[in-house]
């Protein structure tokens, strides 16, 4: 955040944040409302939600949804972290793919026919068409997402400028901490769910406000969220489904339904299920997203009705600082998408999916807390934060 503000000299900072489930196909550690508080306390001025139909998706769809929301908010500049760290290389890579599109698509198909996952096939295809050092390594997860951000900006004819900050010391999937006080989300999650879990172990790797809110969430609700807590619901659901039922679920393709139903029979945990399920053709993240769609019962028809090839249909406002509120007041007449301060009266296919995802997310809570949280989510107004006093209003 500090580096972004230093690099862009921004007037205000806007964060587009996933809701209950994340792009890598797992539940968010804490609710979006607590994560909104974390973002505001760390200097973000506006926090808006990326709908489930875009957030629990491959990088291309995720990026298209996020950029469309930022475009609607008239953002002038985007900043993202990457392994490469040179924004010119992202533009060069997008240009190279466009110039070699026919060859690229042929190579992707060729590598997939050889049994590789789409992600691996894409990475290999890029290696064949990219010869210059002024291109990015498309095997790296943050580079891939950054590439899709640039591609989305160009495809949506946006005037938005892009900047990138090089990630160092810790990689996206690193599972251990280093001695430079920088940690990946993966390593932090692993620590929080370890047998000897302690918030003190992660305090030097995250902002003080974030650590405090994490501890508060666990104290108030008795849990942090991960896949294992949903496994019994997930397994029961699969036990009641036929292969034909599974075929209707989004991202269940090419006979994957048979493998899923076979492997669930002998799995006693989500991790053991995933270990049994994964193949060379399907990445862990791709399979986790498919499992999330099974858990939330998100069908191909529902995603089709959400029309994800287009822009996000609304902007769900989760939180704002005083500065963010002033920005919205000045620009609301220019913003063409509806801004939702709650979802109680709004209707859209994308929001139908969102409501289901929220219901599932809170399903691990005990009653009456579960019902209270779900009801509150639809009526919850944006969190307001006074940055001058560092207090929530």
Curated annotation (Swiss-Prot):
GO aspect biological process, one term: tRNA modification
Keyword terms of this UniProt record: ATP-binding, Cytoplasm, Ligase, Nucleotide-binding, RNA-binding, tRNA processing, tRNA-binding
Lineage: superkingdom: Bacteria
Gene3D superfamilies per the UniProt record, alphabetical: HUPs
Residues of the signal peptide: none
InterPro entries, A to Z: Rossmann-like_a/b/a_fold, tRNA(Met)_cyd_acetate_ligase
Enzyme Commission no: 6.3.4.-
UniProt subcellular location: Cytoplasm
Top EC class of this enzyme: ligase
Positions that bind ATP: 81, 142, 167
GO terms for MF: ATP binding; ligase activity, forming carbon-nitrogen bonds; tRNA binding
SUPFAM superfamilies recorded: Nucleotidylyl transferase
Recorded GO CC terms: cytoplasm
Catalytic activity: cytidine(34) in elongator tRNA(Met) + acetate + ATP = N(4)-acetylcytidine(34) in elongator tRNA(Met) + AMP + diphosphate
NCBIfam families associated with the record: PRK13670.1
Entry similarity comment: Belongs to the TmcAL family.
Function: Catalyzes the formation of N(4)-acetylcytidine (ac(4)C) at the wobble position of elongator tRNA(Met), using acetate and ATP as substrates. First activates an acetate ion to form acetyladenylate (Ac-AMP) and then transfers the acetyl group to tRNA to form ac(4)C34.
Protein name, as recorded: tRNA(Met) cytidine acetate ligase
The species this protein was found in: Bacillus cereus (strain ZK / E33L)
Gene that this sequence comes from: tmcAL
């Amino acid at each position: 955040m500090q580096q972004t503000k230093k690099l862009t000299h921004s007037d205000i900072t806007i964060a587009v944040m996933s809701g209950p489930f994340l792009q890598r196909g797992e539940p968010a550690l804490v609710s979006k409302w607590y994560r909104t508080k974390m973002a505001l306390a760390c200097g973000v001025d506006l926090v808006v939600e990326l709908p489930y139909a875009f957030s629990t998706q491959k990088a291309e769809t995720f990026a298209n949804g996020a950029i469309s929301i930022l475009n609607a908010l008239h953002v002038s500049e985007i900043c993202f972290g990457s392994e490469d760290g040179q924004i010119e290389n992202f533009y060069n890579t997008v240009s190279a793919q466009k110039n070699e599109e026919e060859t690229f698509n042929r190579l992707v198909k060729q590598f997939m026919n050889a049994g590789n996952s789409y992600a691996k096939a894409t990475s290999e295809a890029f290696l064949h068409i990219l010869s210059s050092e002024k291109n990015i390594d498309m095997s790296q997860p943050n580079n891939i997402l950054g590439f899709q951000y640039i591609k989305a900006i160009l495809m949506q004819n946006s005037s938005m400028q892009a900047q990138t900050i090089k990630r160092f010391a810790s990689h996206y999937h690193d599972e251990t901490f280093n001695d430079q006080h920088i940690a990946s989300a993966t390593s932090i999650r692993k620590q929080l769910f370890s047998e000897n879990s302690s918030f003190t172990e992660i305090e030097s790797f995250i902002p003080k406000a974030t650590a405090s809110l994490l501890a508060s969430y666990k104290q108030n609700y008795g849990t942090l969220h991960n896949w294992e807590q949903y496994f019994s619901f997930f397994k029961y659901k699969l036990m009641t489904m036929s292969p034909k039922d599974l075929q209707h679920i989004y991202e269940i393709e090419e006979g994957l339904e048979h493998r899923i139903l076979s492997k669930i029979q002998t799995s006693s945990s989500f991790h053991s299920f995933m270990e049994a399920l994964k193949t060379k053709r399907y990445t862990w993240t791709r399979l986790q997203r498919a499992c999330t769609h099974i858990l939330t019962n998100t069908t191909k028809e529902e995603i089709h009705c959400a029309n994800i090839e287009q822009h996000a249909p609304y902007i769900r406002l989760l939180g704002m600082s005083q500065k963010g509120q002033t920005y919205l007041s000045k620009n609301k007449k220019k913003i063409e998408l509806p801004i939702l301060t709650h979802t109680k009266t709004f209707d859209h296919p994308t929001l139908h999916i969102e409501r289901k995802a929220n219901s599932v997310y809170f399903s691990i809570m005990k009653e009456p807390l579960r019902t209270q949280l779900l009801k509150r989510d639809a009526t919850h107004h944006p969190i307001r934060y006074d940055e001058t006093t560092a207090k929530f209003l």
